[in-house]
Amino acid sequence: MEVERVQAIASLSHSNGTIPAEFIRPEKEQPASTTYHGPAPEIPTIDLDDPVQDRLVRSIAEASREWGIFQVTNHGIPSDLICKLQAVGKEFFELPQEEKEVYSRPADAKDVQGYGTKLQKEVEGKKSWVDHLFHRVWPPSSINYRFWPKNPPSYRAVNEEYAKYMREVVDKLFTYLSLGLGVEGGVLKEAAGGDDIEYMLKINYYPPCPRPDLALGVVAHTDLSALTVLVPNEVPGLQVFKDDRWIDAKYIPNALVIHIGDQIEILSNGKYKAVLHRTTVNKDKTRMSWPVFLEPPADTVVGPLPQLVDDENPPKYKAKKFKDYSYCKLNKLPQ
Protein backbone atom coordinates (compact mmCIF):
# COMPACT_ATOMS: atom_id res chain seq x y z
CA MET A 1 0.00 0.00 0.00
CA GLU A 2 1.34 3.36 -1.03
CA VAL A 3 1.11 5.76 1.91
CA GLU A 4 0.89 9.45 1.20
CA ARG A 5 3.37 11.33 3.36
CA VAL A 6 2.50 14.69 4.89
CA GLN A 7 5.69 16.14 3.39
CA ALA A 8 4.28 15.41 -0.10
CA ILE A 9 0.80 16.68 0.82
CA ALA A 10 2.39 19.89 2.15
CA SER A 11 4.11 20.56 -1.19
CA LEU A 12 0.79 20.27 -3.04
CA SER A 13 -1.12 22.24 -0.41
CA HIS A 14 1.41 25.03 -0.53
CA SER A 15 0.66 25.69 -4.19
CA ASN A 16 -3.12 25.92 -3.74
CA GLY A 17 -3.28 27.38 -0.22
CA THR A 18 -5.68 24.77 1.18
CA ILE A 19 -5.34 21.53 3.13
CA PRO A 20 -7.24 18.24 2.71
CA ALA A 21 -10.38 17.97 4.84
CA GLU A 22 -9.01 15.13 7.00
CA PHE A 23 -6.41 17.55 8.42
CA ILE A 24 -8.96 20.19 9.48
CA ARG A 25 -9.57 19.81 13.21
CA PRO A 26 -13.00 20.16 14.82
CA GLU A 27 -13.52 23.73 15.99
CA LYS A 28 -12.99 22.83 19.66
CA GLU A 29 -9.41 21.76 18.74
CA GLN A 30 -8.46 24.41 16.19
CA PRO A 31 -5.40 26.38 17.32
CA ALA A 32 -6.85 29.67 16.05
CA SER A 33 -9.77 29.50 18.47
CA THR A 34 -8.21 27.60 21.39
CA THR A 35 -4.73 29.11 21.92
CA TYR A 36 -4.55 31.52 24.84
CA HIS A 37 -2.68 34.73 24.00
CA GLY A 38 -3.02 36.66 27.26
CA PRO A 39 -0.39 36.90 30.00
CA ALA A 40 0.35 33.37 31.17
CA PRO A 41 2.89 31.76 33.46
CA GLU A 42 5.91 30.21 31.73
CA ILE A 43 6.88 26.56 31.89
CA PRO A 44 9.48 26.31 34.69
CA THR A 45 13.13 26.42 33.62
CA ILE A 46 15.56 24.62 35.93
CA ASP A 47 19.37 24.82 36.08
CA LEU A 48 20.47 21.19 36.33
CA ASP A 49 23.88 22.33 37.52
CA ASP A 50 22.49 24.06 40.63
CA PRO A 51 25.05 23.32 43.40
CA VAL A 52 22.31 23.28 46.06
CA GLN A 53 20.76 19.83 45.63
CA ASP A 54 17.81 20.45 47.95
CA ARG A 55 16.77 23.45 45.88
CA LEU A 56 17.12 21.45 42.65
CA VAL A 57 15.04 18.56 44.00
CA ARG A 58 12.37 21.00 45.23
CA SER A 59 12.20 22.82 41.87
CA ILE A 60 11.88 19.60 39.87
CA ALA A 61 9.27 18.11 42.24
CA GLU A 62 7.21 21.31 42.19
CA ALA A 63 7.33 21.56 38.38
CA SER A 64 6.34 17.88 38.10
CA ARG A 65 3.40 18.33 40.47
CA GLU A 66 2.12 21.64 39.11
CA TRP A 67 2.97 21.37 35.41
CA GLY A 68 4.19 17.89 34.46
CA ILE A 69 6.74 19.61 32.25
CA PHE A 70 9.88 21.71 32.69
CA GLN A 71 12.92 22.81 30.72
CA VAL A 72 16.47 22.12 31.90
CA THR A 73 19.60 24.14 31.15
CA ASN A 74 23.25 23.31 31.98
CA HIS A 75 22.40 19.64 31.50
CA GLY A 76 25.83 18.59 30.29
CA ILE A 77 24.98 17.67 26.68
CA PRO A 78 27.34 19.75 24.49
CA SER A 79 25.49 22.32 22.38
CA ASP A 80 27.46 21.31 19.27
CA LEU A 81 26.23 17.72 19.72
CA ILE A 82 22.62 18.97 19.87
CA CYS A 83 23.28 20.94 16.65
CA LYS A 84 24.67 17.79 15.00
CA LEU A 85 21.67 15.73 16.15
CA GLN A 86 19.37 18.30 14.55
CA ALA A 87 21.46 18.55 11.38
CA VAL A 88 21.56 14.80 10.64
CA GLY A 89 17.84 14.43 11.35
CA LYS A 90 17.00 17.33 9.04
CA GLU A 91 19.24 15.88 6.33
CA PHE A 92 17.40 12.57 6.52
CA PHE A 93 14.02 14.23 5.99
CA GLU A 94 15.42 16.20 3.04
CA LEU A 95 16.49 13.00 1.22
CA PRO A 96 14.54 11.91 -1.88
CA GLN A 97 11.27 10.21 -0.91
CA GLU A 98 12.27 6.77 -2.21
CA GLU A 99 15.42 6.84 -0.07
CA LYS A 100 13.38 7.58 3.07
CA GLU A 101 10.90 4.81 2.24
CA VAL A 102 13.71 2.24 2.62
CA TYR A 103 13.31 2.81 6.39
CA SER A 104 9.52 2.73 6.44
CA ARG A 105 7.78 0.78 9.16
CA PRO A 106 6.60 -2.59 7.85
CA ALA A 107 2.80 -2.65 7.49
CA ASP A 108 2.43 -5.74 9.70
CA ALA A 109 4.90 -4.58 12.38
CA LYS A 110 3.88 -4.76 16.04
CA ASP A 111 6.59 -2.21 16.83
CA VAL A 112 6.55 1.51 16.01
CA GLN A 113 10.14 1.64 14.75
CA GLY A 114 10.72 3.06 11.28
CA TYR A 115 9.85 5.98 9.04
CA GLY A 116 6.19 6.78 8.72
CA THR A 117 3.06 8.81 9.00
CA LYS A 118 0.45 8.08 11.63
CA LEU A 119 -1.51 5.36 9.91
CA GLN A 120 -4.44 4.89 12.23
CA LYS A 121 -6.88 7.75 11.92
CA GLU A 122 -8.11 9.31 15.11
CA VAL A 123 -11.58 8.77 16.52
CA GLU A 124 -13.17 11.40 14.26
CA GLY A 125 -11.20 10.29 11.19
CA LYS A 126 -8.75 13.18 11.43
CA LYS A 127 -5.04 13.18 10.64
CA SER A 128 -2.04 14.99 12.13
CA TRP A 129 0.28 17.21 10.06
CA VAL A 130 3.49 15.26 10.74
CA ASP A 131 5.81 12.56 9.42
CA HIS A 132 8.18 10.74 11.77
CA LEU A 133 11.08 8.37 12.26
CA PHE A 134 11.23 6.08 15.31
CA HIS A 135 14.17 3.96 16.46
CA ARG A 136 15.58 2.82 19.79
CA VAL A 137 18.97 4.24 20.79
CA TRP A 138 19.56 2.33 24.07
CA PRO A 139 20.17 -0.29 25.46
CA PRO A 140 22.25 -2.01 22.76
CA SER A 141 20.14 -5.18 23.01
CA SER A 142 17.03 -3.20 21.93
CA ILE A 143 18.59 -1.48 18.90
CA ASN A 144 17.65 -2.48 15.36
CA TYR A 145 19.99 -0.68 12.96
CA ARG A 146 17.71 -1.50 10.03
CA PHE A 147 15.75 1.62 11.02
CA TRP A 148 18.79 3.91 11.42
CA PRO A 149 19.42 6.00 8.30
CA LYS A 150 22.68 5.29 6.46
CA ASN A 151 22.50 8.80 5.05
CA PRO A 152 23.81 11.18 6.14
CA PRO A 153 26.86 8.97 6.92
CA SER A 154 27.40 10.57 10.35
CA TYR A 155 23.83 9.78 11.49
CA ARG A 156 24.77 6.69 13.51
CA ALA A 157 27.81 8.14 15.28
CA VAL A 158 25.93 11.33 16.25
CA ASN A 159 22.93 9.43 17.63
CA GLU A 160 25.11 6.99 19.58
CA GLU A 161 27.03 9.85 21.15
CA TYR A 162 23.78 11.66 21.99
CA ALA A 163 22.42 8.50 23.67
CA LYS A 164 25.58 8.27 25.78
CA TYR A 165 25.17 11.81 27.15
CA MET A 166 21.41 11.38 27.46
CA ARG A 167 21.83 8.48 29.89
CA GLU A 168 23.70 10.70 32.35
CA VAL A 169 20.96 13.35 32.23
CA VAL A 170 18.25 10.72 32.64
CA ASP A 171 19.92 9.19 35.70
CA LYS A 172 20.04 12.63 37.35
CA LEU A 173 16.39 13.31 36.55
CA PHE A 174 15.23 9.96 37.95
CA THR A 175 17.28 10.57 41.12
CA TYR A 176 15.88 14.06 41.74
CA LEU A 177 12.32 12.94 40.96
CA SER A 178 12.68 10.07 43.46
CA LEU A 179 14.06 12.34 46.18
CA GLY A 180 11.19 14.76 45.51
CA LEU A 181 8.77 11.97 46.44
CA GLY A 182 10.62 11.32 49.69
CA VAL A 183 12.01 7.95 48.56
CA GLU A 184 15.61 6.95 47.93
CA GLY A 185 17.29 8.24 44.78
CA GLY A 186 17.35 4.95 42.86
CA VAL A 187 13.73 3.96 43.42
CA LEU A 188 11.92 5.44 40.39
CA LYS A 189 14.49 4.31 37.84
CA GLU A 190 14.49 0.79 39.25
CA ALA A 191 10.68 0.64 39.22
CA ALA A 192 10.59 1.85 35.60
CA GLY A 193 12.94 -0.92 34.42
CA GLY A 194 16.38 -0.02 35.78
CA ASP A 195 19.20 -0.43 33.27
CA ASP A 196 16.78 -2.11 30.85
CA ILE A 197 14.72 1.07 30.33
CA GLU A 198 14.37 1.55 26.57
CA TYR A 199 15.29 4.86 24.96
CA MET A 200 13.01 5.35 21.94
CA LEU A 201 14.02 8.30 19.78
CA LYS A 202 11.40 9.90 17.56
CA ILE A 203 12.04 12.61 15.02
CA ASN A 204 8.91 14.64 14.29
CA TYR A 205 8.87 16.51 10.98
CA TYR A 206 6.09 19.10 10.66
CA PRO A 207 6.26 20.67 7.16
CA PRO A 208 4.95 24.20 6.50
CA CYS A 209 1.14 24.21 6.52
CA PRO A 210 -0.93 26.79 4.58
CA ARG A 211 -3.66 26.67 7.26
CA PRO A 212 -1.92 26.45 10.65
CA ASP A 213 -5.08 27.94 12.19
CA LEU A 214 -7.02 24.76 11.36
CA ALA A 215 -4.50 21.89 11.66
CA LEU A 216 -2.47 20.27 14.44
CA GLY A 217 0.93 18.58 14.22
CA VAL A 218 0.05 16.29 17.11
CA VAL A 219 -3.32 16.16 18.82
CA ALA A 220 -3.64 16.67 22.61
CA HIS A 221 -2.18 13.71 24.51
CA THR A 222 -0.05 12.61 27.45
CA ASP A 223 3.03 10.47 26.73
CA LEU A 224 2.80 6.79 27.64
CA SER A 225 6.49 6.82 28.59
CA ALA A 226 7.95 7.22 32.08
CA LEU A 227 9.79 10.38 31.03
CA THR A 228 10.28 12.14 27.70
CA VAL A 229 13.38 14.24 27.01
CA LEU A 230 12.87 16.49 23.99
CA VAL A 231 15.03 18.73 21.83
CA PRO A 232 13.00 21.14 19.64
CA ASN A 233 14.19 23.22 16.71
CA GLU A 234 13.76 27.00 16.82
CA VAL A 235 10.25 26.99 15.30
CA PRO A 236 7.71 27.23 18.14
CA GLY A 237 4.79 24.82 18.29
CA LEU A 238 4.67 22.96 21.60
CA GLN A 239 1.60 23.89 23.65
CA VAL A 240 0.73 22.83 27.19
CA PHE A 241 -2.73 22.63 28.76
CA LYS A 242 -2.55 24.54 32.03
CA ASP A 243 -5.33 26.17 34.06
CA ASP A 244 -7.90 25.10 31.45
CA ARG A 245 -6.17 26.76 28.51
CA TRP A 246 -3.55 26.07 25.84
CA ILE A 247 -0.38 28.09 26.26
CA ASP A 248 2.74 28.23 24.11
CA ALA A 249 6.04 26.83 25.37
CA LYS A 250 8.89 29.29 25.02
CA TYR A 251 11.85 28.14 22.94
CA ILE A 252 15.12 28.25 24.90
CA PRO A 253 18.18 27.43 22.77
CA ASN A 254 20.01 24.28 23.94
CA ALA A 255 17.51 23.56 26.73
CA LEU A 256 15.95 20.11 27.04
CA VAL A 257 12.18 19.89 27.49
CA ILE A 258 11.24 17.23 30.06
CA HIS A 259 7.74 15.69 30.03
CA ILE A 260 6.42 13.63 32.90
CA GLY A 261 4.82 10.61 31.22
CA ASP A 262 2.02 8.29 32.29
CA GLN A 263 4.32 5.74 33.96
CA ILE A 264 5.83 8.29 36.38
CA GLU A 265 2.35 9.57 37.17
CA ILE A 266 1.35 5.99 38.02
CA LEU A 267 4.52 5.21 40.02
CA SER A 268 4.10 8.45 42.01
CA ASN A 269 0.42 7.55 42.65
CA GLY A 270 -0.64 10.81 41.02
CA LYS A 271 1.72 13.13 42.91
CA TYR A 272 3.50 13.94 39.64
CA LYS A 273 1.25 14.72 36.68
CA ALA A 274 1.71 13.56 33.08
CA VAL A 275 1.53 16.71 30.96
CA LEU A 276 -1.30 17.17 28.46
CA HIS A 277 0.29 18.74 25.39
CA ARG A 278 -0.11 19.18 21.64
CA THR A 279 1.81 20.61 18.70
CA THR A 280 0.80 23.41 16.35
CA VAL A 281 2.31 23.98 12.91
CA ASN A 282 3.75 26.96 11.04
CA LYS A 283 2.71 28.53 7.75
CA ASP A 284 6.21 29.19 6.42
CA LYS A 285 8.67 27.10 8.40
CA THR A 286 9.32 23.45 9.12
CA ARG A 287 9.13 22.56 12.80
CA MET A 288 11.09 19.54 14.00
CA SER A 289 11.55 17.91 17.39
CA TRP A 290 13.58 15.03 18.79
CA PRO A 291 11.84 13.43 21.78
CA VAL A 292 13.42 10.42 23.49
CA PHE A 293 10.74 8.35 25.23
CA LEU A 294 12.03 6.44 28.25
CA GLU A 295 9.91 3.32 28.34
CA PRO A 296 9.84 0.33 30.68
CA PRO A 297 10.55 -3.04 29.01
CA ALA A 298 7.32 -4.64 27.73
CA ASP A 299 6.85 -7.11 30.61
CA THR A 300 7.69 -4.69 33.44
CA VAL A 301 4.74 -4.33 35.81
CA VAL A 302 4.17 -0.66 36.67
CA GLY A 303 1.98 0.39 39.58
CA PRO A 304 2.07 2.93 42.43
CA LEU A 305 5.26 2.66 44.51
CA PRO A 306 4.48 0.73 47.73
CA GLN A 307 6.30 3.45 49.73
CA LEU A 308 3.63 5.97 48.64
CA VAL A 309 0.56 3.86 49.39
CA ASP A 310 -1.16 3.43 52.77
CA ASP A 311 -4.65 3.53 54.28
CA GLU A 312 -4.87 7.28 53.80
CA ASN A 313 -3.35 7.16 50.31
CA PRO A 314 -4.84 4.15 48.53
CA PRO A 315 -3.52 3.26 45.06
CA LYS A 316 -5.14 5.42 42.35
CA TYR A 317 -3.95 3.24 39.46
CA LYS A 318 -3.95 -0.45 38.60
CA ALA A 319 -0.57 -2.19 38.36
CA LYS A 320 -0.13 -3.65 34.89
CA LYS A 321 2.49 -4.72 32.39
CA PHE A 322 3.77 -1.84 30.29
CA LYS A 323 2.86 -3.68 27.07
CA ASP A 324 -0.75 -4.03 28.25
CA TYR A 325 -0.90 -0.36 29.25
CA SER A 326 0.49 0.63 25.83
CA TYR A 327 -1.98 -1.59 23.98
CA CYS A 328 -4.94 -0.05 25.81
CA LYS A 329 -3.69 3.49 25.29
CA LEU A 330 -2.88 3.12 21.60
CA ASN A 331 -6.22 1.42 20.93
CA LYS A 332 -8.14 3.95 23.04
CA LEU A 333 -9.37 1.28 25.46
CA PRO A 334 -10.00 1.97 29.16
CA GLN A 335 -7.07 1.16 31.47
Swiss-Prot record:
> What does the record give as EC number?
1.14.11.9, 1.14.20.6
* Principal location class: cytoplasm
Name the top EC class.
oxidoreductase
**Assigned GO CC terms:** cytoplasm
Q: Which cofactor does it need?
A: Fe cation; L-ascorbate
| Catalytic reactions on record | a (2R,3R)-dihydroflavonol + 2-oxoglutarate + O2 = a flavonol + succinate + CO2 + H2O; a (2S)-flavan-4-one + 2-oxoglutarate + O2 = a (2R,3R)-dihydroflavonol + succinate + CO2
Fe2OG dioxygenase domain residues: 196-296
The pathway to which it is assigned is: Secondary metabolite biosynthesis; flavonoid biosynthesis
Its tissue distribution reads: In the juice sacs/segment epidermis (edible part) at the early developmental stage.
The record, for SUPFAM superfamilies, names: Clavaminate synthase-like
Q: Which residues bind Fe cation?
A: 221, 223, 277
Result of changing residue 68 to A: Reduces activity 95%
Q: Which UniProt keywords apply?
A: Cytoplasm, Dioxygenase, Flavonoid biosynthesis, Iron, Metal-binding, Oxidoreductase, Vitamin C
Location(s), subcellular: Cytoplasm
Gene3D superfamilies noted in UniProt: B-lactam Antibiotic, Isopenicillin N Synthase, Chain
Q: Which InterPro entries match?
A: DIOX_N, IPNS-like_FE2OG_OXY, IPNS-like_sf, Iron_ascorbate_oxido_reductase, Oxoglu/Fe-dep_dioxygenase_dom
Which terms does the record give in the GO molecular function aspect?
flavanone 3-dioxygenase activity; flavonol synthase activity; L-ascorbic acid binding; metal ion binding
**How are cofactors bound according to the entry's free-text note?**
Binds 1 Fe cation per subunit.
Q: Which PANTHER family match?
A: 2-OXOGLUTARATE (2OG) AND FE(II)-DEPENDENT OXYGENASE SUPERFAMILY PROTEIN-RELATED (PTHR47990)
Q: Which family does it belong to?
A: Belongs to the iron/ascorbate-dependent oxidoreductase family.
Q: What does this protein do?
A: Catalyzes the formation of flavonols from dihydroflavonols. It can act on dihydrokaempferol to produce kaempferol, on dihydroquercetin to produce quercitin and on dihydromyricetin to produce myricetin.
Q: What is this protein called?
A: Flavonol synthase/flavanone 3-hydroxylase
Species source reads Citrus unshiu
